[in-house]
Amino acid sequence: MATFVSELEAAKKNLSEALGDNVKQYWANLKLWFKQKISKEEFDLEAHRLLTQDNVHSHNDFLLAILTRCQILVSTPEGAGSLPWTGGSAAKPGKPKGKKKLSSVRQKFDHRFQPQNPLSGAQQFVAKDPQDDDDLKLCSHTMMLPTRGQLEGRMIVTAYEHGLDNVTEEAVSAVVYAVENHLKDILTSVVSRRKAYRVRDGHFKYAFGSNVTPQPYLKNSVVAYNNLVEGPPAFPAPCASQNPASHPHTDDAEQQAAFLLACSGDTLPASLPPVNMYDLFEALQVHREVIPTHTVYALNIERIIMKLWHPNHEELQQDKVHRQRLAAKEGLLLC
């Protein structure tokens, strides 16, 4: 096994020396061929273009070394699953002695290339219940955030593509927190377009969908909402690290809440339907800073547009007729 590994490394080294500055283009073409984005003929043409006529053999030697390495890795131990070989190994009576040399060559050939049973390398088929399938699934299928293991696997693949060897735990933790905060920003932008909210410190949004809404026809309502002192109630014995002046007293907080309730409207806001793709599309158009990368933003906007749907006039008419039939049927049942 070590011999084949050394042969592969030697073939790779010879190929890199023959390619010179074109080695990156060769590895890119090799990756495209592995991903089945280009055919074997196209890959050979590109390799011949990058190599000179005297160094084309290094390309073939490298591919043969890879195939030999793969065959050694997937092959079964010697003698296991092999078919019996009955021809050519034993000398037949009546033949001249001059055939002994051919017999020795055949023995070496048989020792190097032994026939194998094709079914010995086939994967055993085991029927699985679809409910018990534990294969990795995309987040769009599970409707859940990616786990730490899924993120780490994706980061390892990306690291290998960029020439890195490994991914640290600190990097995985940073990506996990980044995904959570990114989704929180998107949800905040969507909800802030649908519901009223308050602002603390000039930028922090909170109290989404509060039932206490200001009355626009009262002058005091605007003053009351602009003069809010936000913060938790004061503690009886504040700690040394806390500033008592920054927290309102309990009586002041109760008076402020009663004043806001008196200045609010007498009707509650109408209930809204669930969030749909139109709400997400509008929120991303208004809050462009949520997805700062233009490539990611454009790709997701295209996906959202492809999923947008609304009923046409014929579907609305059919829905109206269906509702009338249901109403008539319920009326007959009541009678």
From Swiss-Prot:
Keyword line: Nucleus, Transcription, Transcription regulation
GO molecular function, one term: transcription coactivator activity
InterPro entries, sorted: Hfi1/Tada1 (IPR024738)
Keyword match Transmembrane helix: no
Cell compartment(s), UniProt: Nucleus
Signal peptide as annotated in the record: none
GO cellular component: nucleus; SAGA complex
UniProt superkingdom: Eukaryota
GO BP: regulation of transcription by RNA polymerase II
Major location category of this protein: nucleus
Keyword Transcription regulation attributed: yes
Transmembrane spans: none
The protein's assembly and partners: Component of the STAGA transcription coactivator-HAT complex, at least composed of SUPT3H, GCN5L2, TAF5L, TAF6L, SUPT7L, TADA3L, TAD1L, TAF10, TAF12, TRRAP and TAF9.
Family that this chain belongs to: Belongs to the TADA1 family.
Function: Probably involved in transcriptional regulation.
The name this protein goes by in its record: Transcriptional adapter 1
Species of provenance: Rattus norvegicus
Lineage: Eukaryota, Metazoa, Chordata, Craniata, Vertebrata
